[in-house]
Amino acid sequence: MVFSVAKKDTTPYEGQKPGTSGLRKKVTVFQQPHYLANFVQSTFNALPAEEVKGATIVVSGDGRYFSKDAVQIIAKMAAANGVRRVWVGQGSLLSTPAVSAIIRERIAADGSKATGGFILTASHNPGGPTEDFGIKYNMGNGGPAPESVTDKIFSNTKTISEYLIAEDLPDVDISVIGVTTFTGPEGPFDVDVFDSATEYVKLMKTIFDFESIKKLLASPKFSFCFDGMHGVAGAYAKRIFVDELGASESSLLNCVPKEDFGGGHPDPNLTYAKELVDRMGLGKTSNVEPPEFGAAADGDADRNMILGKRFFVTPSDSVAIIAANAVQSIPYFASGLKGVARSMPTSAALDVVAKNLNLKFFEVPTGWKFFGNLMDAGMCSVCGEESFGTGSDHIREKDGIWAVLAWLSILAYKNKDNLGGDKLVTVENIVLQHWGIYGRHYYTRYDYENVDAEAAKELMANLVKMQSSLSDVNKLIKEIQPNVADVVSADEFEYTDPVDGSVSKHQGIRYLFGDGSRLVFRLSGTGSVGATIRIYIEQYEKDSSKTGRESSDALSPLVDVALKLSKIQELTGRSAPTVIT
């Protein structure tokens, strides 16, 4: 059978602007007639012709509700637009880091390589018929489309009048591995359904010393727990942690991917990963002895949370500790780090490591594509952000399972001569040792979700206006908390990319204090309704005798300053944040 190409008339939808992580909306929005098709055609039209005609693209995601329908629609549109091959992870499941790896690494049996891919995910947002869906396009380097491309996509969505689709192309059974070939007006079109985990596992084995991690996991003194939060990480967890590294299956929690993430919010933090938090002894008291090490990943497995026994590692500390230990612990970095980078709201723990180890250091806006540019230019090896994203230049996305393996590698290295000893070096030991050398950045983030957009704008505008007179700001701060250090500089963060010279403005409001502490205020665009205000509060403590305080006590004066300075309750009516991290 030869499929035919149909031109379908359509009209633009408002608001199809892809943010730092693509287009995210409620499923019901994506189910509107032509809504997904408009965005997909606008993307094809924004790409160079050679990345569409005769090209190979990946289409898969975190398995959330509507993914299976979306794969079939995109495959039919790809065929109609002259794409030669579509690669699909079995069951439409591929983690975001795995898509990046597959675009960069996979060579199919016929020798083809991918030029890009559609990732179907709304990351850590909930899934289900009334929840969120998302789509983003990644380029040939495996990283998210840069602003030059996403701006073009958005512009196309505003003027689109028709799209191409092979309506008579039958649906492909994506649960079965194999290549299905169709014939169209321009020749053959293949849909290649392949195993979701194989390529990614192969890549991880080139980065980490699996044998040393295996020895750690085999030690009777070491216990391990991983929570997949019913996201796509489950497709990798059994393969890596159980089959390759020898962990017991009982150490895996919620590792069956589900379209609605089991009704949960697949965001690996202390609020939403409740089951893991309790098991690790950080929740309600339990008589069961917690494991030595616990970790979780989010819906599309690009975020991670690291826990020790009754101990939480902040993401800002996590990236700093990985960078400080990478060269000794991880074979991939044995010849040294090219540089390190963090997003602006992430604590300055990484800056201190970079300074001490004489590493190139970069502070970038929120959004993984900024790290990608540095990596493509060979300027950065390890990077991270406070929102539970950590990664390296092995791919161009953050990578939850990579971060877990990095921590297991550090633990394996620290315990290599100690596996038969009385006591293992623990996660907590490693963090305390790090603070002893580099000082501690007490850190918290307050999220106010679904705030009225106008109120949020007014709050941010006030904070910018106040920056014109720091003496007034300091006077106000002294009235709120007399012992807090003075603000020495304040600005709206702006970034000039050292690679391509592009400028990103309005990236968050910063108040920097004389003792190295910071307050940062940002409006976030990753939710699908309302605005989210994020307040980042960071208190630096150099004195190693004072690094063991309760975080909430150490931060209390600065929290008070942040809430009163921003007038958040007055302007938004919110007396407390939705989430505290």
From Swiss-Prot:
Known catalytic reactions: alpha-D-glucose 1-phosphate = alpha-D-glucose 6-phosphate; O-phospho-L-seryl-[protein] + alpha-D-glucose 1-phosphate = alpha-D-glucose 1,6-bisphosphate + L-seryl-[protein]; alpha-D-glucose 1,6-bisphosphate + L-seryl-[protein] = O-phospho-L-seryl-[protein] + alpha-D-glucose 6-phosphate
Positions with a binding annotation for alpha-D-glucose 1,6-bisphosphate: R24, S123, D302, R303, T366, E385, S387, K398
Cofactor(s) for this UniProt protein: Mg(2+)
SUPFAM superfamilies in the record: Phosphoglucomutase, C-terminal domain (SSF55957), Phosphoglucomutase, first 3 domains (SSF53738)
Cofactor binding notes: Binds 1 Mg(2+) ion per subunit.
One GO cellular component term noted in the UniProt record for this chain: cytosol
GO biological process, one term: glucose metabolic process
Modified residues (Phosphoserine): S123
Assigned keywords, A-Z: Carbohydrate metabolism, Cytoplasm, Glucose metabolism, Isomerase, Magnesium, Metal-binding, Phosphoprotein
Catalytic site positions: S123 (phosphoserine intermediate)
Subunit structure: Monomer.
Similarity field: Belongs to the phosphohexose mutase family.
Name of this chain's protein: Phosphoglucomutase, cytoplasmic
Name of encoding gene: PGM1
